[in-house]
């Protein structure tokens, strides 16, 4: 390919170059006298194609003479470490260290980008240099911080007194020495042995030492200052993701991967590499990780894992509307990586030569071993090189992490100019050809799912027929007795004919509909089934990718029809949020609900696909995860795969996982501006979320809101010296927790493309809507003991700790038990509970005499809940075990065991409660109000009324 030095610049680029040239001459008037015309011409050209280089040189014109004195052609990557060591050695403050690292990074990046634009070096050499620079900067920062912290806390040592280092594992392209120009860096921090520091004022546990060091290292590299940043650092690939410790020991790392390591983590670990000078610890670390990554047998399960991972990426591309993405799209950079890594995982256990981080080296080894043909290797390498060069140049234009082709004319001109292409169309042709080759080899490796388009279906004729008689004859020939089918189909077809869906969309719809009709016509009432399906189609007519999804995936079509027939609620969800159609592709996965213990880890893994700093996409990711998991629960519910008794457990544990991530995101956002309260121990937040009502009772339904109360641990009396946060904009600690609570509510309530996360009701907090949004925990306890009404103690029966520090969990449990165990006069209590129940019924019960409101009618859910709450408040003073549970089922079981309620009554209340809740779930999925004909519930309701009267009306 040509380079830019041999071509005249398009006018759109010279306009940019002129502006920068003027700025540079103003900053450095003697420019033209110090460099010759040839170099001036080259400088002018580079300023036209790269905003990053132009901005840096306008700020640092003194770099220019050295660039033309041999620095452009020759970059000695082996000298990076030495140069940085010399620069960092005299450094005495963190601010100074940040400035040194950023200045060095920017100066070297200018050199490396300049070489790329002019084609002075091969792409392979450029990637090696970018990776070496990144590694040198990380290690320089690490080593400087290690010296600083050792002076402050002493040297971390094992139990024999041997010094322990912080090991940094480079993941992804950094590990493979193939880093992009403006990539973020995925790191994992670890250390060899537990122990404590020696030589400091007081001994500090090694893990605490390295966590402090890790936090400061991330900040040293990641923080944006006046000089920019060194690298965007992503630590989410560490064990347990964001909820795990920032740094763990070798043994903890090994235990995690042996016991909990997932398939995607195996793929990630293929490129894992200990950064910095190679030591015995590096050997130990790689030897320890190898059995997890490379199995001793030939491991074909890797292919299935790859399919699932690719499916997730494809879904993400659709959901985020990532068009023109040369990394994640079909045939993109990621597919080359998947092809090579799948072979490495399958055969790496038997073939040590495949255990390498570099894609270039691994693909050559695959050819040597006969695993890939020469033509496949050549196609993959040349196509990969083209896409990586495009990616590198795109990022070097503005030092932005992007893999998306330009959306503006200027950057297209720049890219075409640097690639030696005459036009956008010519470059697109080359890119599309490369991606087509990659995708073909990817499908050869993992298996494709193309559909036979030649199948001739009678439904094809039905979809295209114009005459009513012909259509009715076709339907009659199939013995379908549904007079509404053709009128409904024709009406819908005529309606969508008026809509503008584009030629590609129209063509895909015409291919899809015969197959979809083949799913519908065998049903008892095809027209009835078509109605909800058509509403889903209405929403995706202009989103061709979803039409293509249904066309290309028979399983997705089958599930669409099946679920729309089974539940109007599900069909409404699919119509409102078409991205859920992705979940229908794999029926086995759709009906395999996440285990109750795994919602947290699944959500953390899901959010790994979203840039940590992209708050909008993080919010969208939370909502999409909730929607997809709710769909799986509902699908398993309506088909009987999931027992109805388990539905609320799943919906509640899903909410808990989301609450955890919302609080953590809110914490990051608030603390990034204001720092954190200084009274906290390392890793603590001093904050808790308490669930009330259905959330507290583990009884959430589809569409339930969350009744929450927020607590914190700070008080001026206990921490008089820690009144403010420690950030650049410190604020009073109470104000910090108020901002945190407000941010949490914002994250829950903001309506994105995927809707609202949850509606949150905070009215059960102390003093209700007029009270503080977040309460100090001891004030909360005092309020409950001295000011709370009986109905607030009833609510406390169903309160449960849902997220927060262990110390707060323990304290809340104690306070709750103390309040529930207060002595109460039973007659007075019974009267207050009855009066509250009567007020509720008068205010909320709106149903005709022949209907039964599952919640509010006499003998309904509310009566059962009030029985449980009264009996706990009346008897917990003498039976402390009654204050343990927050859910009604276990409360009634305990009451029966204690003989405070006859065993038969306890069992009948449990059965009635489960029946009413199950019916409520069923009616929600049918999008019907929570009411049944009175005769259907009369037996259950009558027994509840009798028990209610026996317990409360004495």
UniProtKB/Swiss-Prot annotation:
Enzyme Commission designation: 2.7.7.89, 2.7.7.42
Xref: InterPro entries: GlnE, GlnE_rpt_dom, NT_sf, PII_UdlTrfase/GS_AdlTrfase
Annotated stretches, region: Adenylyl transferase: 456-954
Keywords of this entry: ATP-binding, Magnesium, Multifunctional enzyme, Nucleotide-binding, Nucleotidyltransferase, Transferase
GO MF entries: [glutamate-ammonia-ligase] adenylyltransferase activity; [glutamine synthetase]-adenylyl-L-tyrosine phosphorylase activity; ATP binding; magnesium ion binding
UniProt-annotated stretches for the region Adenylyl removase: 1-450
Annotated function: Involved in the regulation of glutamine synthetase GlnA, a key enzyme in the process to assimilate ammonia. When cellular nitrogen levels are high, the C-terminal adenylyl transferase (AT) inactivates GlnA by covalent transfer of an adenylyl group from ATP to specific tyrosine residue of GlnA, thus reducing its activity. Conversely, when nitrogen levels are low, the N-terminal adenylyl removase (AR) activates GlnA by removing the adenylyl group by phosphorolysis, increasing its activity.
Name listed for the protein in its UniProt record: Bifunctional glutamine synthetase adenylyltransferase/adenylyl-removing enzyme
Gene name tied to this protein: glnE
């Amino acid at each position: 390919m040509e380079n830019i030095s041999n071509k005249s610049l398009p006018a759109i680029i010279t306009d940019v170059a002129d502006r920068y040239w003027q700025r540079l001459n103003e900053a450095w008037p003697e420019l033209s006298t110090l460099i010759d015309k040839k170099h001036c011409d080259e400088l002018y050209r580079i300023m036209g194609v790269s905003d990053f280089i132009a901005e840096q040189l306008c700020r640092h014109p003194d770099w220019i003479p050295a660039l033309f004195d041999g620095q452009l052609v020759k970059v000695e990557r082996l000298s990076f470490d030495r140069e940085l060591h010399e620069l960092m050695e005299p450094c005495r403050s963190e601010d100074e260290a940040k400035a040194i690292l950023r200045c060095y990074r920017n100066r070297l990046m200018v050199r490396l980008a300049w070489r790329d634009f002019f084609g002075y070096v091969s792409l392979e050499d450029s990637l090696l240099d970018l990776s070496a620079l990144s590694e040198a900067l990380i290690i320089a920062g690490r080593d400087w911080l290690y010296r600083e912290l050792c002076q402050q806390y002493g040297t971390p040592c094992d139990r024999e007194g041997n010094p322990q280092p912080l090991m940094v594992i480079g993941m992804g392209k950094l590990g493979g020495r193939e880093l992009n120009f403006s990539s973020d860096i995925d790191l994992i921090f670890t250390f060899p042995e537990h122990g404590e520091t020696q030589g400091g004022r007081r001994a500090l546990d090694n893990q605490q030492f390295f966590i402090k060091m890790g936090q400061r290292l991330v900040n040293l590299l990641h923080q944006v200052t006046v000089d920019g940043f060194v690298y965007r650092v992503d630590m989410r690939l560490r064990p347990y993701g964001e909820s795990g410790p920032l740094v763990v020991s070798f043994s903890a790392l090994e235990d995690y991967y042996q016991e909990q390591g997932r398939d995607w983590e195996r793929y990630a670990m293929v490129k894992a590499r200990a950064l910095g000078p190679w030591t015995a610890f590096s050997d130990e670390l790689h030897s320890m990780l190898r059995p997890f990554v490379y199995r001793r047998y030939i491991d074909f399960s890797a292919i299935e894992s790859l399919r699932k991972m690719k499916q997730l990426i494809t879904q993400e591309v659709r959901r985020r509307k990532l068009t023109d993405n040369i990394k994640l799209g079909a045939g993109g950079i990621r597919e080359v990586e998947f092809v090579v890594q799948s072979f490495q995982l399958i055969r790496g256990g038997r073939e040590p030569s495949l255990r390498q981080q570099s894609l270039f080296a691994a693909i050559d080894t695959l050819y040597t071993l006969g695993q890939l043909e020469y033509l496949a290797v050549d196609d993959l390498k040349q196509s990969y090189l083209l896409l990586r060069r495009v990616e590198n140049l795109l990022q070097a234009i503005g030092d932005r992490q992007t893999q998306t082709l330009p959306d503006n004319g200027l950057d297209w001109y720049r890219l075409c100019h640097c690639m030696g292409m005459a036009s956008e169309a010519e470059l697109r042709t080359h890119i599309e050809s490369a991606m087509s080759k990659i995708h073909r080899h990817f499908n050869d490796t993992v298996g494709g799912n193309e559909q036979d388009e030649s199948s001739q279906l009678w439904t094809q004729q039905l979809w295209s027929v114009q005459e009513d008689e012909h259509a009715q004859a076709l339907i009659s020939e199939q013995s379908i007795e549904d007079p509404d089918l053709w009128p409904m189909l024709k009406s819908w077809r005529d309606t969508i004919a008026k809509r503008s869906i584009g030629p590609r969309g129209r063509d895909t719809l015409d291919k899809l509909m015969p197959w979809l009709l083949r799913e519908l016509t065998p049903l008892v009432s095809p027209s009835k089934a078509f109605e909800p399906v058509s509403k889903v189609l209405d929403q995706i007519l202009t989103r061709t990718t979803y039409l293509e999804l249904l066309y290309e995936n028979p399983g997705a079509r089958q599930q669409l029809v099946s679920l729309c027939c089974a539940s109007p609620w599900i069909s409404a969800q699919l119509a409102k949020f078409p991205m859920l159609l992705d979940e229908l592709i794999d029926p086995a996965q759709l009906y395999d609900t996440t285990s109750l213990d795994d919602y947290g880890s699944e959500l953390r893994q899901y959010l790994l696909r979203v840039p940590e700093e992209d708050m909008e996409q993080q919010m969208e990711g939370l909502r999409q995860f909730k929607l997809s998991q709710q769909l799986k629960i509902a699908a398993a519910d309506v088909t009987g795969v999931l027992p109805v008794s388990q539905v609320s457990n799943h919906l509640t544990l899903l909410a808990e996982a989301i609450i955890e991530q919302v609080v953590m995101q809110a914490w990051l956002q608030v603390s990034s501006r204001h720092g954190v309260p200084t009274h906290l121990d390392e890793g603590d937040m001093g904050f808790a979320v308490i669930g009330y009502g259905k959330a507290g009772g583990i009884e959430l339904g589809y569409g339930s809101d969350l009744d929450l109360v927020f607590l914190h641990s700070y008080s001026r009396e206990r921490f008089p010296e820690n009144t403010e946060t420690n950030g650049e904009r410190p604020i009073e600690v109470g104000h910090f927790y108020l901002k945190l609570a407000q941010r949490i509510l914002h994250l829950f309530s903001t309506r994105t493309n995927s809707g609202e996360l949850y509606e949150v009701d905070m009215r059960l907090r102390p003093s209700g809507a007029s009270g503080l949004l977040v309460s100090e925990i001891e004030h909360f306890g005092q309020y409950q003991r001295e000011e709370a009404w009986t109905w607030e103690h009833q609510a406390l029966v169903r309160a449960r700790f849902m997220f927060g520090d262990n110390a707060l969990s323990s304290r809340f449990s104690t306070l709750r038990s103390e309040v529930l165990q207060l002595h109460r006069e039973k007659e007075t209590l019974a009267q207050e509970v009855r009066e509250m129940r009567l007020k509720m019924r008068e205010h909320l019960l709106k149903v005709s005499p022949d209907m039964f409101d599952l919640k509010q009618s006499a003998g309904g859910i509310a009566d059962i809940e009030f029985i449980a709450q009264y009996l706990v408040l009346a008897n917990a003073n003498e039976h402390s075990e009654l204050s343990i549970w927050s859910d009604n089922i276990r409360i009634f079981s305990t009451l029966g065991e204690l003989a405070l309620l006859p065993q038969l009554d306890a069992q009948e209340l449990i059965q009635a409660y489960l029946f009413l809740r199950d019916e409520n779930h069923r009616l929600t999925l049918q999008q019907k109000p929570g009411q049944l004909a009175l005769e259907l519930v009369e037996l259950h309701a009558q027994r509840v009324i009798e028990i209610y009267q026996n317990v409360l009306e004495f």
